[in-house]
A protein has these predicted regions:
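Beta-strand-loop-alpha-helix segment that lines the small-molecule cofactor/substrate pocket
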Residues: 1-23, 37
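Active-site Tyr-X1-5-Lys
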Residues: 7, 29-33
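Charged, alpha-helical scaffolding/interaction elements associated with membrane systems
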Residues: 10-11, 36, 227, 256
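Alpha/beta-hydrolase
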Residues: 15-18, 34, 45-47, 57
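Contiguous beta-strand/loop segments that form the cofactor/metal-binding neighborhood of enzyme cores
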Residues: 28-29, 41, 46-100, 104-238, ...
Length: 287
């Protein structure tokens, strides 16, 4: 992502990333409410993805590359290994070489809105626990159950994900919450609402989703291209760069088993074990 970010800046390109919720009207309304200050001081934020529709990934033998597939191109810089359907379309996301599990798959969408709402870029430290608790013997490598805790110095963000369980926080399979001293704002792709703390503020009933955020996101991108106005992008390349880093931090903390600390000036962690996991290794002629 740093290479893409630097290339976009160097060549003056207009690049929009897929955080389309920034173009969804009810998400915009929720953030406007958050920024009104009615919730009071925010001390904790949560983001979560509970995926009950996802089951185990049974082990299957390696197989010949399907006709019409340029496997070398599909692999790109990833390590070369025999073709296996589990590592191909969709299920590739459960292997470290290609994807990074739910922590990044859903995390880049939901954590982005925590960062956006709270006006933050990176945490001071991260720690994480979890494992393959639901399907310990299947072919997935990434954890099916995980919690990561991010310290932003003046508030804490908690990420949770599970596979095989769908009843998440506030009875939502996915979402975000901003927990303030006066009340809590809960937000997902279906709508948002506010729960008051001891009647300090008025409750806000569910404000339902309207419009199509993905279409509006594409329209925003095209408008910026037509008018050469990169400053009006709802989610420029810097947005993707930032949230990809923060989501990956959760995985790095999980994989090292350490509480990790970030040095933003040096753009690296403070330990070699953590830095090793964000140092790219290119294969198949890529560099």
């Amino acid at each position: 992502i740093n290479i893409m970010y630097n290339a976009a800046r160097k060549h003056g390109k207009i690049v929009q990333v897929g955080q389309w919720q920034r173009s969804q009207p009810h998400f915009v309304d929720a953030i406007n409410y958050l920024k009104s200050g009615k919730l009071g001081r925010i001390r904790t934020c949560k983001a979560w993805s509970y995926v009950d529709w996802k089951g185990a990934v049974p082990k299957v033998p390696d197989a010949p590359v399907p006709a019409g597939v340029n496997y070398d191109m599909w692999l790109g810089p990833a390590p070369k290994r025999p073709f296996n359907m589990n590592r191909f379309h969709f299920t590739w996301r459960w292997y470290w070489e290609y994807g990074n599990g739910l922590m990044t798959d859903w995390g880049v969408h939901l954590i982005d809105y925590i960062l956006y709402g709270m006006g933050k870029s990176v945490p001071a430290s991260v720690m994480a626990i979890g494992g393959k608790y639901a399907f310990p013997d299947d072919d997935m490598v990434t954890p099916d159950t995980m919690t990561a805790v991010y310290d932003f110095s003046d508030f804490t963000m908690i990420w949770e994900h599970t596979i095989g369980i769908g009843l998440g926080n506030w009875k939502r399979p996915h979402g975000m919450s901003y927990i303030g001293e006066n009340g809590t704002l809960v937000l997902d792709r279906n709508g948002w609402e506010v729960f008051p703390e001891k009647q300090k503020i008025e409750a806000v009933p569910v404000q339902k989703n309207v419009g199509n955020g993905q279409d509006l996101h594409a329209r925003n991108f095209l408008d910026c291209l037509e008018n050469n106005t990169p400053e009006k992008l709802n989610a420029g390349i810097e947005v993707g760069r930032r949230v990809a880093l923060v989501a990956q931090m959760g995985n790095v903390a999980y994989r090292t088993g350490e509480k990790i600390y970030w040095d933003d000036a040096k753009q690296q962690f403070k330990t070699d074990t953590a830095n090793k996991l964000i140092t790219p290794v290119y294969n198949n002629g890529y560099n």
